[in-house]
Regions:
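An N-terminal hydrophobic leader/cap segment in hydrolases
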Residues: 1-31, 35-45, 315-320, 324-335
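Short beta-strand element of the alpha/beta-hydrolase
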Residues: 51-61
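The serine-hydrolase catalytic nucleophile loop
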Residues: 61-74, 255
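Catalytic nucleophile-loop/oxyanion-hole region of alpha/beta-hydrolase
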Residues: 63-68, 91-125, 297
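Conserved alpha/beta-hydrolase
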Residues: 66, 73-97
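Short beta-strand/loop motif that positions the catalytic acidic residue
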Residues: 237, 243-245, 249
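Short alpha-helix in the alpha/beta-hydrolase fold that links the catalytic acid
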Residues: 239, 253-263
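Catalytic active-site module of serine/aspartate enzymes centered on a nucleophile-bearing elbow/loop
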Residues: 275, 280-335
Length: 335
């Protein structure tokens, strides 16, 4: 690791100057169909001539943007890891802001961006990290027949709340809205969830000019389709992969996450369970990497990446969050 900061210490102060700051993009990903996706980059201060030891493509969640990584990215950069965080299609400052492009299209965008990073940094380890919707997108990317060559996936609370895990009233309401008012834009409504215990991070998300506050019904339907696809693809995710989940997640139900984790574990069997790792945080919320205790998952992510770079995927995580993670998640479902 480079620098004097231990993982987690570099983000104790808010990593932005103003709550409503519009930070210019660092550059553009130009994709094969002509789409240009803006990205922010956080680079290590002391970078070797042949590039950083690792590069992370970081994908944000629904209605979020490239700014989703303002808290974790400086910590990764302090550890010598470059973070490249694009606005996904339909979000942030992308050309199709506010409209849904399809989960498969987004998965292929991610694959294309990972290949571009591999070309640009041929001597670096390439990782893909996704939060919430971004994690679901990467689960599809990992199961493409021509999936890009990456060194590992980090999936923080991937969005897996598909129709099969919704009650019939919610499924029926969504079906009716999609067939009657698909273009209507909906606000957050009366129901409030606590996405993180970091109040400043939530205020920043609400004031960020790149955040979308009113969502088209058909975009909601598209995200649910994506979650269905991600849940179905779970047994076939090609590792190495690290799944992160917090006990206080109010957006992705424990039952849905346990279904995915259990399917992955069954697919690989007891003798190959280190290919995909699971970490369960008793104090964590949905936005784990922005939480007050984000130092714990950040330490784990960096340690896991360093283990992969050293040819090991079986080193215990520093926080101990991987100890009996599936069993602890299963036990917590009824609480």
């Amino acid at each position: 690791m480079t620098g004097d900061n231990e993982p987690g210490q570099a983000v104790m102060q808010a990593p932005f100057t103003k709550l409503n700051a519009l930070v210019p993009a660092s550059g553009l990903f130009r994709l094969a169909d002509g789409t240009a996706l803006p990205y922010r980059a956080w680079m290590p201060a002391d970078m070797p001539k042949d590039g950083p030891w690792a590069v992370v493509l970081a994908l944000h969640g629904m209605n979020d943007s490239r700014d989703a990584w303002e808290y974790p990215a400086p910590v990764l950069a302090a550890a010598g890891i470059a973070v490249i965080a694009p606005d996904q299609r339909g979000f942030g400052a992308s050309p199709s802001r506010g409209y849904w492009s399809g989960g498969e299209a987004m998965a292929r965008d991610a694959a294309a961006m990972l290949r571009l990073l591999r070309q640009r940094y041929p001597h670096s380890r390439i990782f893909a990290m996704g939060e919430s919707m971004g994690g679901a997108v990467l689960m599809l990317t990992a199961t493409l027949h021509d999936a890009p060559a990456v060194d590992g996936y980090i999936l923080s609370a991937p969005a897996l709340w598909g129709r099969s895990k919704m009650n019939i009233a919610l499924r029926s309401t969504l079906w009716l809205a999609l067939h009657t008012i698909p273009g209507a834009r909906l606000g957050p409504g009366p129901v409030r969830v606590k996405a993180s215990d970091n109040r400043i991070a939530l205020i920043r998300l609400g004031h960020d000019p790149l955040t979308i506050h009113k969502t088209r019904v058909d975009v909601i339907g598209g995200v649910v389709d994506l979650m269905d696809q991600a849940l179905e693809s779970a047994p076939y995710v090609k590792g190495p992969a690290l799944f992160l989940y917090g006990a206080h997640d109010e957006l992705v139900p424990k039952r849905a996450m346990h279904t995915a984790w259990a399917a992955l574990a069954r697919e690989r069997g007891a003798d190959d369970n280190v290919e995909v790792r699971f970490a369960y945080y008793p104090d964590g919320y949905h936005l784990l990497l922005r939480d007050q205790r984000r130092d714990l998952p950040m330490q784990d992510v960096i340690a896991w990446m360093m283990g992969i770079a050293g040819g090991r995927n079986d080193i215990p995580l520093p926080s101990g969050a991987d100890h009996d993670a599936i069993a602890r998640l299963r036990a917590a479902q009824g609480r």
